[in-house]
Amino acid sequence: SEMCIRDRDEFVSMGGSYKSHGNCSPVAEYNYWCDPDAAKYVYENLRTKIHMVGLDVTRKIVLTPNILEYMQILDTEKGEFVKNITRFYYDFHWEYERVIGCVINDPLAVAYFLNRELCSGFEAYTTVETEGISIGQSVVDAMNFWKKEENSIVLTEVDEKEFMVMFLHRVFGKSEQEIRTILRQIMA
């Protein structure tokens, strides 16, 4: 419990949002919405800054039909597997956001943990709403109204192409140069 979170040098969280809309309510990101009390507790009690890999950056990581097709060319079995497990998300993102593709949130948090050059942002005090209509919303005090010590690094920018190179290289084992060449053709 308390011991588990206090002894960490670094903490990367795939959750929250700064300026982006929510993905399970108008304002909340799903992970924080599921257990807002836990998210708030961690933000308020961790002794190191939380790297918030929120919807502001994860929404920029879109598995497009072209990338999905490329995955199937790289490895038919793995590509088909990815296609099958993302079908729900393709439908969700089309219905609610009119995006042709699938936002793949979680892999960005892992990639950022491995390579901090992928994302950038700013430090701020962050908390999480635990009640009412905005339950689960991450509240980022970007303008320092509360004059509280910064407890987070809120990520707002991501190098989408470099993420995709890293992701495809790690999952499919192809050379980064080969992947970059193809991605130049299929990523706008």
Regions of interest found by a model, annotated:
Residues 2-5:
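Short, small-residue-biased leader/transition segments that mark boundaries at the very start
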Residues 41-50:
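A structural motif corresponding to the C-terminal end of an alpha-helix
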Residues 9-10, 49-51:
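Residues at the starts of beta-strands that form the adenosine-phosphate
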Residues 33, 37, 50-188:
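Conformational coupling and interaction surfaces
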Residues 10-41:
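Active-site glycine-rich loop that binds ribose-phosphate moieties when present
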